Amino acid sequence: MGKLAVISDLHVDINHFSATDLQLIAELLDANQATHLHLAGDIANKETAAMTVIDFFQRQLPTTFHWGNHEMADLSESLIETYPDPAFLNFQTVALSEKTLLLGVNCWYDYGYSDLQSTEEILRLKHLFWYDRMIQRTGTDPEISHQINERLRQTLRGLPQDKEVIVTTHFVPKATFIVKQTGKYVRWNHLNAFLGSPEFGAVIDEADNVRQVVFGHTHRRFEDQVIGQTIYSCRPLGYYYEWQLTRRFVLENQLTENFQPTKLRGLLRTNQAAFNQYKAAHLRAELQQAITWINY
């Protein structure tokens, strides 16, 4: 028996993670008796920073990874899909045990979660607001996504049917995990176009031996959901100003009446020393909530 730990959306650069913070994660993995770590994308914005993190954890325990959209902005298309590292799992598997395989897939999005009908408007928003405007890829987003989903179908069909498969990906595979905003925030629903692909989830539905799917990207944490016969787990770490510990810090110190994560960075800088002290006391608990643990 072993225990898989999956972490998505570490964002070590945006979150200003130090060597001490990474060591805290390593200690948490050890305390929970993790025997394999998989990093499910958005480790860092830059390839070198991401690989430094991967190297750190590989010195602690077996560690694999695939990319999220943030690393992709620093990579050519060939390196996005086929990165020359044996720990890179994009349409590759690693045997966790005699009966359990871990399959990693970067994934992509096809606008299937958007409330907009106009592809032109979706692309306008992408180029105006979305980080992925910096990613250079061949083909349209729906074309790329469909190719990936078809490759997933063929990959799953080619795996031994007597093995249980744990799939890790970065993007959202099921509409259950898409939050629909209302009121003055309803316009944010337009950006759901870039969160994932419902077709990816439909391909998973075809496979009888996929035990669990783990993903992130949405920066929202959910309770595990069983859809069909598969467990879906989404608990990304996300940005520091989105964390639960940050929410508690702001509200406990009465720094604002309304918790709006995207407007907190200046407020936190003004109270940096106090926030750093609070974070040091509560980061371990935040990390514990943002790791998916799977016994195998």
Where are these regions (language model features)?
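Beta-strand-turn-beta hairpins that frame and shape the catalytic cleft
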Residues: M1-A5, T93-G104, Y109, V226-Y232
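Active-site neighborhood of phospho(di)ester-bond hydrolases with catalytic His/Asp-centered motifs
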Residues: V6-S8, L37-D42, T63-N69, A87-N90, ...
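Metal-dependent phosphoesterase/phosphodiesterase active-site architecture
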Residues: I231-Y296
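Conserved beta-sheet core of the metallophosphoesterase superfamily
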Residues: D55-H66, K99, F177-Q260
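N-terminal active-site segment of His-dependent metallophosphoesterases
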Residues: M1-Q58, M72-S78, Y131-T138
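Active-site-proximal loop/helix segment associated with metal-binding centers of metalloenzymes
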Residues: G104-Q161, F171-L191, Q260, R269-A273
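Active-site environment of divalent metal-dependent phosphoester hydrolases
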Residues: V12-N15, A44-A49, N69-E77, V94-A95, ...
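Glycine/small-residue-rich loop that forms an oxyanion/phosphate-binding "nest" at active or ligand-binding sites
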Residues: L75-Q92
